[in-house]
């Protein structure tokens, strides 16, 4: 293989879910991948979100589609839209997480059955469903990435319900890596350090969480949106063809300090 192609995304076709605004991890990934020559279909939640997202995606040539993963048929519809547009998919990035605020801000033991189930459905099961929907349209193999966080494997104050939900997501990633490996589809969880996104703003005392992370980080700073996108782009390249089933940290080294 030409070594130049190993680190290229030119001509690759991708689906990226979860843009809320220009601070979203999903947007950072979509922007970088477009700059690197990939073609991208991306999602925002609904028409209300589109007003904030489209001014940033349209100039980049990103095809923006509404997708509420809780709404029957919408996840399947966006996959079909991308496949009809591109003919195939080479990479898929899932950057969606949600829980009802009452459950997110309370203790895990107090989480409602419905709130817990919805958090898992939106944040975790939707990635497994993406695997089912996208794998048949990835004839050349490729990569599927989901976004997670350190609080999946250790207790992070105020992260609450999302901790066990992200732990479930990371387990799904590992099982999907086995189930899709025969199709040459690589599956990873990317674990960024805290950055101020719309989703993160729902976490109680998030400013305190960021300050703690910065104080612990060997690099003595927080990770940047572009750095999360850079790791994600690499994992979608042929250069990462020997890797699958991992949770990979991009957090300025915070994970190594515990």
Q: Where in this protein do the model-derived segments appear?
A:
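Short-chain dehydrogenase/reductase
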Residues: 2-118, 202
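A glycine/serine/threonine-rich, flexible loop-to-helix segment
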Residues: 54, 182, 192-217, 227, ...
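Catalytic loop of short-chain dehydrogenase/reductase
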Residues: 18-31, 97-136, 140-182, 194-196, ...
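A conserved structural motif in NAD(P)-dependent oxidoreductases
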Residues: 217-228, 239
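Short C-terminal tail/terminal secondary-structure segment
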Residues: 244-258
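Short, small/polar-rich loop/turn modules that mediate ligand/substrate recognition or access, typified
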Residues: 181, 186, 243-245
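Non-catalytic, hydrophobic alpha-helical segments
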Residues: 144, 227-231, 235
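Conserved SDR Rossmann-fold cofactor-binding beta-strand/turn motif
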Residues: 186-196, 236, 249-251
